[in-house]
Curated annotation (Swiss-Prot):
Motif ('HIGH' region): 43-53
Protein name (database record): Leucine--tRNA ligase
Top-level class of the enzyme under EC nomenclature: ligase
Subcellular location field: Cytoplasm
Disulfide bonding pattern of the chain: none
Catalysed reaction equations from the record: tRNA(Leu) + L-leucine + ATP = L-leucyl-tRNA(Leu) + AMP + diphosphate
Keyword Isomerase in annotation: no
PANTHER family with a match to the protein in the record: LEUCINE--TRNA LIGASE, MITOCHONDRIAL, LEUCYL-TRNA SYNTHETASE
């Protein structure tokens, strides 16, 4: 066996240079082969890549290299999601301009990514902070405005008091800003919004077409869109208790069947009726002020203690005007959802039950489970939300829930209040329009001018892009564009008078909602897309990224392709940007805590193993270290591993192989030094194996032998079986399964080499074929090693340009088959026989089985039924 070691430090830069020189990963838009577009979510240029990047981009690269080998015109680009708050924070903390900080980080991260050997088309690279990119984003904003998909409206918005910017509802997590962690406040402000709700039903329906998306992501989007069918009901207000001018309270409910269980009404703190009540009652006003300081995230509202205050206003039951319901301002009702008002039926809604138990309002069950005595059915601490029949509901008693809903709807549709129906069937959506205005400097400027005479004026297309000024100061909190002495002062393009620019910039999620389309032709200076190119190259066939983007980025991107179609910039099948989506798991690592409570990094400790016990000590001084739980790699826990260190020590191929081999790709991968060392040993083993096979391959006949002996045929079957299984794994993105088959086949080939000192010509030919196949199998995962091995085997060109080997179907057929055996219809065992065995031979093998003899006992065999290649049934 060869003792020569593979030198990754020498090999990897060499092959990367050859790939770049040959431009083999550049994609031609005029290439008419079938396209395949693979894309990993582009990174934010924080300054360093982490092991999560290595895993994510390696997965995409395996897909790209495999599809390229299969003859597709592969598009595999890379860019930078470059706007955002960290650049402004760096400007404040380090006194460096956001632009300089961002582009310095891009240069550093690009250099790191290039050491990974990714098959990227770098010619298409752009950053979203490039004016040449956001020029087109501004153009699309104006085009969306023309077709009614952009509006300006005054809204109660989530205000982050630390970052001093507005956040979308999705960016409020547990009542706190997703970046700053500050408690979010509600403020009324002017806001530019994208009308995503116009596509609510379409976005919901189209989820059923996304059969290559994870079910959990589709469910998350389905729940976020939140379609519900129900009834809009108008409750008359008791004039004796109601502020002047208020006559009714409108609510939306999906459970009109429970109206006779109503015990209270509840309204949001910013509902007009609440404001009217607050004007008369200081206690109500104080409660409303307290509500405004609380979080707005649905999860926090659902888990917070239910609180309210009685306004003194009374609403009349729509079926009985003498039945008066108290109207509360409640902390669990939001103006953004439905009408900002509800009726509470505590017996059948846990939230409502918690509320009435707190304020002693009582409850009346109106749905009784089947088979239970209505007279004894009571609700105490747990609401009943199951099926049953109506009770305590007058004319609804005895009906099913479905029947009761229909009866209530019919009656309220015909009843009148103020000349309009009391009830109206309605479809409601949880989804709200996307507020994109952000009070930050480092973002895409909104191309609008505010004129005291002409009001809102779009920036003319000829004046795009509206470029960010670079001479800004961050000495004051808030938006640096507001403080700039000259940038915002302009002449109105409509009347020529003095005007000011819009100083809000776009939410950075806008930047990432269409970048995938721009990659199809980033050289177009006149328009965001080139229609014939984008329509041919889109959708993305395989998109890879984190599940944390399930709602924000992925939903916004789905809206954007539809908006771009409405504006004439794209027209693709199903209007969906991503045909296939894969959400990879995280990279996790043990944590290590020193005696003083501070965390230690993996580079600072030594691990020793004594039997089943692992101990950690500091390299400096030998002090014991507590081995903590396995957690997501993070700077705060200091459990990160620097990709540069791993690549510098072991090589990129080792890092790539380990990231793919340890666990299913949709699950977290536990980083371990032992695992990386194991991957490195496998790299060296493959290198030695190929070098051992090279002389045999060189001596093998050029022409395919007319026939193959048993050893050669066995090896060829293993090779073609591996081809089939590895490709199947890659197609299913089950990379760890593919790698296991590569290991298995390498063992088979290694055994054949060990037995074949002077192989026959047919076996030598099979060894050459099998070794070439092995190299092509691991090429997508370890491309540098594959190129080196390709050369050793005397193959021409680059393995990165070689076509995937053709599988010979005959070699996938097993010589033997295993058939289930039944005795009198009950399975008793299995029998393995040659595939072409005659019926008599199969019968004899079956009757010789101990399990069959035992099942028959003393009974004679009446007949044996053999269903060819399916099953055998013995009748006794």
């Amino acid at each position: 066996m060869s003792n020569e070691r593979y030198n990754a430090r020498e090999s990897e830069p060499k092959w990367q240079a050859k790939w770049d020189e040959a431009k083999i990963f550049a994609t031609r838009n005029d290439d008419l082969r079938k396209k395949y577009y693979v894309l990993e979510m582009f990174p934010y240029p924080s300054g360093r890549i982490h092991m999560g990047h290595v895993r994510n981009y390696t997965m995409g690269d395996v897909v790209a290299r495999t599809m390229r080998a299969r003859g597709y015109n592969v598009l595999h680009p890379m860019g930078w999601d470059a706007f955002g708050l960290p650049a402004e924070n760096a400007a404040i903390e380090r006194k460096i301009a956001p632009k300089a900080w961002t582009y310095d980080n891009i240069a550093a991260m690009k250099k790191q990514l290039q050491t990974m050997g990714l098959s990227l088309d770098w010619a298409r690279e752009f950053a979203t902070c490039d004016p040449s990119y956001y020029k087109h984003q501004q153009k699309m904003f104006l085009d969306f405005l023309k077709v009614g998909l952009v509006e300006r409206e005054k809204r109660k918005l989530n205000w982050d008091p630390v970052d001093m910017t507005v956040l979308a509802n999705e960016q409020v997590i547990d009542g706190r800003g997703w970046r700053s962690g500050a408690v979010v406040e509600l403020r009324e402000m002017n806001q530019w919004v994208f009308k995503i709700t116009k596509y609510a039903q379409e976005l919901l329906d189209a989820l059923d077409t996304l059969d290559r998306w994870p079910d959990k992501v589709r469910l998350m989007q389905r729940n976020w869109i939140g379609r519900s069918e129900g009834l809009m009901v108008r409750f008359a207000l008791d004039s004796a208790t109601t502020p002047a001018g208020e006559t009714e309270l409108k609510i939306f409910t999906t459970r009109p069947d429970t109206l006779f269980g109503a015990k209270f009404m509840a309204i949001a703190a910013d509902h007009p009726l609440a404001q009217a009540a607050a004007a008369k009652d200081p206690k109500v006003a104080a409660f409303i002020d307290d509500c405004k300081k609380r979080g707005t995230a649905q999860a926090e509202i659902d888990t917070a203690e239910k609180q309210g205050i009685d306004t003194g206003i009374r609403a009349m039951h729509p079926f009985d005007p003498s039945w008066k319901l108290p109207v509360y301002v409640a902390n669990f009702v939001l103006m953004e959802y439905g009408t900002g008002a509800i009726f509470g039926c505590p017996a059948h809604d846990q939230r409502d039950l918690d509320f009435v138990n707190k304020y002693q309002l009582g409850n009346t069950p109106v749905v009784c489970p089947e088979g239970q005595d209505p007279a004894s059915f009571v609700i105490t601490d747990t609401a009943y939300d199951g099926d049953g029949r109506m009770i305590n509901s007058r004319f609804l008693d005895g009906m099913t829930i479905v029947e009761a809903k229909e009866e209530v709807a019919k009656r309220l549709e015909t009843a009148q209040l103020g000349g309009a129906p009391v009830g109206e069937r309605k479809v409601n959506f949880r989804l709200r329009d996307w507020g994109i205005s952000r009070q930050r400097y480092w973002g895409c400027p909104i191309p609008i001018i505010h004129c005291p005479t002409c009001d809102v004026v779009p920036v003319p297309d000829a004046d795009l892009p509206v470029v960010l000024p670079e001479d800004v100061s961050f000495d004051k909190p808030g938006n640096a564009l507001d403080h700039h002495p000259t940038w915002k002062h302009v002449t109105c393009p409509k009347c020529g008078g003095k005007a000011v620019r819009e100083t809000d910039t776009m939410d950075t999620f806008v930047d990432s909602s269409w970048y995938f389309a721009r990659f199809t032709d980033p050289w177009n200076t006149e328009a965001p897309t080139t229609p014939d190119v984008v329509n041919r190259m889109m959708p993305v066939d395989q998109y890879i990224g984190g599940v944390e983007h399930a709602i924000l980025h992925l939903l916004y991107s789905r809206f954007f392709t539809r908006a771009m179609k409405a504006a004439g910039h794209i027209d693709i099948q199903h209007d969906e940007p991503f045909a296939g989506l894969f959400t990879q798991g995280m990279v996790v690592h043990e944590t290590y805590r020193k005696a003083d409570g501070h965390f230690a990094s993996p580079a600072e400790i030594s691990i020793t193993v004594e039997g089943d016990t692992r101990r950690a000590t500091l390299l400096d001084g030998g002090s014991p270290v507590e081995i903590g739980p396995i957690e997501k790699m993070s700077k705060s826990k200091r459990n990160t591993v620097d990709p540069d260190d791993i690549i510098g020590t072991y090589g990129a191929d080792t890092a790539r192989w380990f990231m793919l081999s340890d666990s299913p790709p949709d699950r977290d991968v536990i980083w371990s030094e032992e695992g990386v060392k194991g991957a490195s040993r496998f790299v060296q083993r493959l290198w030695r194996m190929v070098n051992d096979a090279a002389p045999i391959a060189a001596s093998a006949p050029a022409e395919r032998p007319a026939s193959f002996g048993a050893d050669a045929l066995t090896l060829r079957k293993a090779a073609h079986g591996a081809l089939d299984k590895v490709l199947s794994g890659i197609e299913r993105l089950a990379f760890n399964v593919s790698l296991a088959h590569i290991r298995e086949f390498s063992n088979t080939l290694g055994d054949a080499l060990a037995r074949s000192q002077t192989p026959s010509p047919d076996l030598a030919w099979a060894i050459r074929e099998s070794t070439v196949i092995l190299v092509q199998l691991f090429h997508p995962m370890m491309p540098h090693l594959a190129e080196e091995c390709w050369t050793v085997l005397g193959q021409t060109g680059l393995v990165s340009e070689a076509l995937w080997p053709q599988i010979e179907p005959d070699l996938l057929v097993e010589d033997s088959i295993t058939l289930p055996v039944q005795v009198n219809g009950k399975k008793r065992g299995e029998v393995t026989v040659p595939r072409d065995a005659p019926t008599s031979e199969i019968e004899a093998a079956v009757l010789a089985l101990d399990a069959v003899k035992q099942a028959l006992g003393d009974k004679p065999v009446r007949k044996v039924i053999v269903v060819p290649q399916r099953i055998v049934n013995v009748v006794g």
